[in-house]
């Protein structure tokens, strides 16, 4: 893969002030020289690294396509670790595409998705956790998600994994030396010292796994579902929270027949709000489909906003559907239309929710919405991102396997079985953790990871 010179558009689709075509590989400078004419001075191949040259992108016949800046970055001090040239032209779709076409005609190959970052990984510029952080940084929706991605890009996860693997390697070396050379009087760790090392590694692994759910929330968003009986004002609540008229609102019960999703940021966490069909028995086949989708949304929710009509009071129908809510999600009670019944007893709703927090609001006047947003932000903030070691699903799966192997090693030590069995478990944990940083990752895993990238990254 690394022997070919590749090129791709590195900026997003659509019109913009600047468009970038990235070229990387052993012949990147030669390819760029064939299509770029400096306004004055030496050709690109004679330019120093990390310099900018003004000129024109031209056809083989010398016709000018667009004026551009050429950035020369010689390997290994570039993103990919190879010679890289970036051509910055005007950001029109046609202009950027024409520049890319010239680069391909001059000898470059169109890059595959994620191929630039894959080359950075293969050339030792990034480990696998840092490569994945590039995607997280691009897709970050909040400051907290961005901070976590930047921490991984700096190598925080690599360093944490490295410390655990180093300790595992030290224990393996002592155990295997004693196994292979029993006749020598080597200074080796006692089984008690190995057990203490396993306990330390297990504690570090558990700490990393503690950030798995938070990492998923920051990447994918907190799923907050507005649920309640028909005509309690769920759609009005959604519109007020997202500050636009996104959902249709009428006084007719059952207006909302499908799930509507909108994004909002609260507490530094991206929150995806779902307006749902009202929960009630119905003979209407379309409404039944909507109610079924409401139950599907509830099953996947991180937070359920339990909406009741304060003007009508908390009735037995409300208590019935509240009692049937799936377990696992956080809950916040919302008594809407509180302006029509200021005497509504919030304590009754709190009791029905088993002590969950409740707020009284009015989607009509905006009363109580600061308190509601604060409660949602509190739930979102409960996913602590302070350590910034927020692993993704793939990384968590590898770390869980390492945890299982460490537990097996502990059990082997406690049972008094041979050191060779302990060493096998420790090596398996060491290998599993290596998948996080890519040190023990195979081609199939790399293909899977880098296929998530866009072309040009």
UniProtKB/Swiss-Prot annotation:
Database matches in Gene3D superfamilies: P-loop containing nucleotide triphosphate hydrolases (3.40.50.300), Probable tRNA modification gtpase trme, domain 1 (3.30.1360.120), tRNA modification GTPase MnmE domain 2 (1.20.120.430)
Residues binding GTP: 231-236, 250-256, 275-278
Cofactor binding, note field: Binds 1 potassium ion per subunit.
Annotated residues for binding of K(+): 231, 250, 252, 255
Domain called TrmE-type G: residue spans: 221-381
Binding-site list for Mg(2+): 235, 256
Cofactor: K(+)
Keywords assigned by UniProt, alphabetized: Cytoplasm, GTP-binding, Hydrolase, Magnesium, Metal-binding, Nucleotide-binding, Potassium, tRNA processing
EC assignment: 3.6.-.-
Gene Ontology CC: cytosol
UniProt function note: Exhibits a very high intrinsic GTPase hydrolysis rate. Involved in the addition of a carboxymethylaminomethyl (cmnm) group at the wobble position (U34) of certain tRNAs, forming tRNA-cmnm(5)s(2)U34.
Family: Belongs to the TRAFAC class TrmE-Era-EngA-EngB-Septin-like GTPase superfamily. TrmE GTPase family.
PANTHER family cross-referenced by the UniProt entry: TRNA MODIFICATION GTPASE GTPBP3, TRNA MODIFICATION GTPASE GTPBP3, MITOCHONDRIAL
Quaternary structure note: Homodimer. Heterotetramer of two MnmE and two MnmG subunits.
Protein name, UniProt field: tRNA modification GTPase MnmE
Species of provenance: Symbiobacterium thermophilum (strain DSM 24528 / JCM 14929 / IAM 14863 / T)
Gene: mnmE
């Amino acid at each position: 893969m690394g022997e070919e010179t590749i090129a791709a558009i590195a900026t997003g689709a659509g019109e913009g002030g600047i468009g970038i075509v990235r070229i990387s590989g052993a012949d990147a400078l030669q390819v760029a020289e064939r299509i770029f004419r400096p306004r004055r001075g030496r050709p690109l191949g004679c330019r120093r690294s990390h310099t900018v040259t003004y000129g024109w992108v031209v056809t083989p016949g010398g016709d000018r396509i667009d004026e551009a800046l050429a950035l020369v970055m010689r390997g290994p001090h570039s993103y990919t670790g190879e010679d890289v040239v970036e051509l910055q032209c005007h950001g029109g779709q046609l202009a950027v595409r024409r520049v890319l076409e010239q680069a391909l005609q001059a000898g470059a190959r169109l890059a595959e998705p994620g191929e630039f970052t894959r080359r950075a990984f293969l050339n030792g510029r990034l480990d696998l956790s840092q490569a994945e952080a590039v995607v997280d940084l691009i897709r970050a929706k909040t400051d907290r998600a961005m901070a976590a991605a930047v921490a991984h890009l700096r190598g925080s996860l690599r360093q944490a994994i490295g410390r655990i693997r180093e300790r595992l390697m030290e224990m393996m070396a002592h155990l295997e030396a004693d196994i292979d050379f029993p006749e020598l009087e080597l200074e080796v760790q006692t089984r008690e010292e190995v057990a203490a090392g396993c306990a330390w590694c297990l504690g570090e692994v558990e700490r990393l796994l503690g950030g798995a759910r938070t990492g998923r929330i920051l990447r994918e968003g907190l799923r907050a579902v507005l649920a309640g009986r028909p005509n309690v004002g769920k759609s009005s609540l959604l519109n007020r929270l997202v500050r636009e008229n996104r959902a249709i609102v009428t006084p007719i019960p059952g207006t909302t027949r499908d799930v509507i999703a909108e994004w909002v940021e609260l507490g530094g966490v991206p929150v995806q709000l779902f307006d749902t069909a009202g929960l009630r028995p119905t003979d209407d086949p379309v409404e039944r489909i909507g109610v079924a989708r409401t139950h599907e949304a509830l099953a996947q929710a991180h937070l359920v906003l339990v909406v009741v009509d304060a003007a009508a009071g908390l009735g037995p129908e409300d208590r019935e559907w509240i009692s049937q809510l799936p377990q696992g999600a956080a809950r916040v009670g919302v008594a809407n239309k509180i302006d029509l019944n200021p005497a509504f007893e919030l304590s009754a709703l709190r009791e029905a929710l088993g002590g969950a927090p409740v707020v009284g609001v009015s989607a009509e006047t905006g009363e109580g919405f600061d308190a509601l947003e604060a409660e949602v932000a509190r739930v979102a903030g409960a996913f602590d991102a302070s350590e910034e070691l927020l692993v993704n699903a793939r990384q968590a799966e590898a770390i869980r396997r390492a945890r299982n192997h460490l537990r097996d090693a502990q059990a082997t030590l406690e049972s008094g079985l041979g050191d060779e069995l302990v060493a096998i478990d420790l090596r398996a944990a060491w290998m599993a953790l290596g998948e996080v940083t890519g040190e023990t990752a195979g081609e199939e895993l790399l293909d899977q990871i880098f296929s998530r990238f866009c072309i040009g990254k």
